[in-house]
Amino acid sequence: ESLKAAGLPLRRFKTGTPPRVNARSVDFDEMELQPGDALPVPFSYGTQSPPENRAVCWLTWTTEETLRIVRENLDRAPMYSGVIEGVGPRYCPSFETKVVRFPDKLRHQLFVEPMGLNTEELYIQGFSSSMP
């Protein structure tokens, strides 16, 4: 509100950033564990010792209910209501774009990735959205 009061116009931008969720709110029993490489290869030839690969990810899928909710609320999505204009990324479309572009798919794959080794924050890869 203070930015508006200062005369700065506010709007949504297409950042393509998926939501973050708290790991304490996630049922990992419903997901498939995706461990890292047993012998991870470092990015640099200058790495003296192999990195410790302690972080794990999980694979999960959206449900038909998720797709229904998105379809029923597309008019609220700034990318589909005209609030945000422009073309989104080709290879990482928003979730609502996947729902529109692939109407025959009953589910979409998501990867749940830790944001770091010492945080409860998780990144939901494949779930970027402009939905409110």
Feature map (PLM): residue ranges:
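An anion/pyrophosphate-binding glycine-rich loop and adjacent beta-alpha core
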Residues: 2-131
